């Protein structure tokens, strides 16, 4: 204890009393900041599909758009052991979102029951054509209740190799592209970790448990973009994840594509969704892995009423977002509904993800110190930094949990609110991370 006594004495001597009982360092003065959070923050909020007819009307109150993408659209073949790509289709998708000042939530998939986008035939897989032409590649077919569906052949070694290599190449090209906010990954129908309605044959129409572990471990190593898998991956029949501590330690997030349906919660009856969140989320996954999804389509009622301020099925959106620490949520069919005004979209978006608050800001003209609180419901999952007139803090806001705070020091003076901003290499130049600051008094 003696070795700490002298620094403590110096610290005590460097403080002077304030009327409110707090202390401010000698030579430092409080900086009166006035700043408000007025809109949805980048990489958070309600999400619309890129093809939505009202995407321009709602553009100012959302930050994200969703798009399924097809590997077969960007892969042209393989030569000399390397996959050949033409990314022009995908670049067009990203640039289209960017034109509306939005980032993408991207999901690559192989199977989509009944969908005709690949070649006009219902249910065709999005497996690259060069693989489909291999003699030892044989897809299976099922007239699934969700639509006719062809299934990728997971006995094929080339498909297994390609699926891993694709994300290696994707990461090399797009890891630091600010047009992409999040990735959703998976296998089966819509990449949602199931093939409900079709008999499961692990290693044939769905990847084996061993390959799933190999794949998930690989993407965790190569991807810097925050990525999520379906809560359906909690099912140990389909996946090995919840019974494998190495897999549970990976930095994946979760998406729930039937969020807020009538029996979502255990207390509401079935509770399948909540149980999945508990089993694969363990109440802490959201600390490092982004959480999102899509409002339920179990009935047409759900999407059109979840924004009711009086609540739906006993829950308001704000309560559900806080409970599950939601950062983004697809709400395509809420637009134009009685509860889905642009203002309500803005309110709901602000109620998701991170929100920062600055308190105790003081400066001596050469150095500025303040505390930042996260007053949102989730952390920010990519690096972001405070800066003053171009001088940047060395402390990232990434991972700052709700209710927690960081002390920030920037080696330059501050005279007004406009000089203090938040920057990130992972948002578009047209986007801005706001913060709340309405007090020039020291607070706890």
Placement of each model-derived feature along the sequence:
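Alpha-helical packing segments of well-folded alpha/beta enzyme cores
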Residues: 89, 93, 162-166, 170, ...
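Catalytic-core regions of glycoside hydrolase
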Residues: 27-52, 98, 182-192, 196-335
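N-terminal substrate-binding region of glycoside hydrolase catalytic domains
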Residues: 24-158, 284-322, 326-340
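Conserved, mostly hydrophobic/aromatic
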Residues: 65, 97, 170, 183, ...
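Extracellular/luminal regions of secreted and cell-surface proteins that mediate adhesion/ECM remodeling
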Residues: 350-444
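Bacterial Sec-dependent N-terminal signal peptides
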Residues: 1-3, 8-10, 15-29
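Long, well-ordered mid-to-C-terminal structural blocks that present hydrophobic/aromatic surfaces
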Residues: 321-372
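Active-site groove signature of glycoside hydrolases
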Residues: 137-159, 163-203
